[in-house]
């Protein structure tokens, strides 16, 4: 329970803040303001199931090493909507893209934006590193993940496994909050987390939870995956919403966590043609890094 603690706010602008050309500004105003605010928001509400009101909205900068040989990293901004019992975790850019594509003619509009951003060398601003929406404690005692394998919408539900945290004495300040360190071996990686008892919600990014306070920062021991909070807000946090982006024809296919991870890593595709048919390309030969979960 959040209680009466005061949450200080460090707002992050919705877009990246990079300089844009006048043409880009006009296009973004037309598509985003008219298309998103007028058209997308009702669709988001219509295509989402409210679990409960959100107490907090936190944003994290995710960094992932996608080539362990060169050390190349990609980054993404992810949103954590935390309620009293449940939470939702997803990419800001993914939500924008899925919301836009759900509109009438949204697929065509999204392609136009992709072409525009590609010409300007800014395609990463419209793409996400993940297709996952992760819902903690929905249903009760479980974690549900909705994602896509290629173009196939899939869903799997797993027991909400509690990382076995060891609390440490180290302390540092993040966004003005005093945070303490904890460590845990979880899903094949050793994780370090920094949490604050000033915000007594036992949640965090991805599938990390179970500490005496909100997790502000987390990373694995190899620094291949990391999450750093960049903003926290208790004002107008909205709802913890379970989104349904299936188009009515392709409902979510139920899979297991292990099957999803094997498919995502390319192990289920015995040749490139099958992978191509699934819309994944030859992921088995292209992947140069380990998945976040290594216990599959």
What is the predicted role of each segment?
Residues 174-175, 186:
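Structural motif
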Residues 180-243:
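Gly/Pro-enriched, hydrophobic low-complexity segments
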């Amino acid at each position: 329970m959040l209680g009466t603690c005061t949450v200080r706010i460090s707002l992050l602008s919705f877009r990246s803040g990079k300089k844009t050309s006048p043409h880009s500004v006009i296009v973004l105003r037309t598509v985003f303001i008219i298309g998103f605010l007028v058209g997308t928001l009702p669709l988001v509400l219509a295509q989402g199931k409210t679990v409960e009101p959100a107490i907090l909205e936190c944003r994290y900068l995710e960094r992932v090493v996608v080539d362990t040989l060169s050390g190349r990293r990609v980054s993404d901004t992810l949103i954590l909507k935390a309620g009293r019992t449940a939470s939702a975790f997803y990419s800001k850019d993914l939500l924008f893209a899925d919301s836009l594509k759900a509109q009438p003619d949204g697929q065509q509009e999204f392609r136009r934006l992709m072409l525009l951003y590609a010409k300007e060398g800014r395609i990463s601003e419209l793409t996400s590193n993940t297709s996952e929406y992760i819902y903690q404690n929905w249903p009760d005692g479980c974690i549900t993940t909705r994602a896509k394998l290629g173009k196939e919408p899939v869903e799997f539900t797993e027991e909400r496994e509690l990382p076995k945290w060891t609390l440490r004495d180290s302390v540092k300040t993040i966004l003005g909050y005093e945070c303490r360190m904890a460590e845990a071996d979880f899903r094949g990686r050793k994780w370090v987390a920094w949490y604050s008892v000033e915000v007594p919600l036992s949640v965090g990014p991805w599938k990390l939870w179970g500490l005496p306070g909100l997790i502000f920062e987390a990373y694995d021991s190899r620094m291949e995956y990391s999450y750093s909070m960049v903003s926290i807000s208790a004002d107008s946090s909205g709802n913890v919403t379970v989104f349904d982006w299936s188009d009515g024809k392709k409902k979510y296919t139920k899979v297991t966590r292990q099957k999803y991870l094997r498919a995502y890593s390319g192990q289920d595709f015995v040749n490139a043609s099958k992978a191509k048919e699934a819309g994944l390309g030859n992921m088995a030969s292209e992947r140069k890094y380990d998945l976040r979960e290594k216990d599959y």
